Amino acid sequence: DLNAGFIDMDRFPFQYAWRRPGLYVVVIDASSANVDSFQRQWIETALNSTNRNPDDLCLVMGHLPLTAFSEGRARPGECIADPWGLADLLRRSRVDLVISGHHHAWYPSESMGLRLLSLGAMGSGPRRIIGSGVIAPPSLTLLEWSRASDLIRETTIDLNTMQSMTSDGLP
């Protein structure tokens, strides 16, 4: 029962916190570049909730990314405004992975002291990755985690070839 894990769903589906044993998820309303002070306060409260176990894997998900990953989206309004302020909040709150979309280019990275994952497009609209000129293929990402080892294993499948993608060719 998915509903059983909700911690805060007052603004569902735009903003909510959800927990299962070993996993704590915070979804932020990052549909526009401005994550205002009210939402930042909510994020801080959600991430520091007594419902969160310190051993939980913590994921934060939102539509717009903290930083640009694809060509044509590296401009104001296409990424979070004041990304360093939000990144500082996420670091202090011990977030394990920040997942975003919008840029339609699969790109796992570490930036601003955080582990970031930009999800690719599943259908039309994949974009070129900044610095490579390569158009990201349609893709699907699967996340697996082990509570015993605190590891997040990410597998991304190229939907054209159905083969696992690697970050070897990424800038």
Report the location of each language-model feature.
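A short C-terminal boundary segment appended to hydrolase-like catalytic domains
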Residues: 141-171
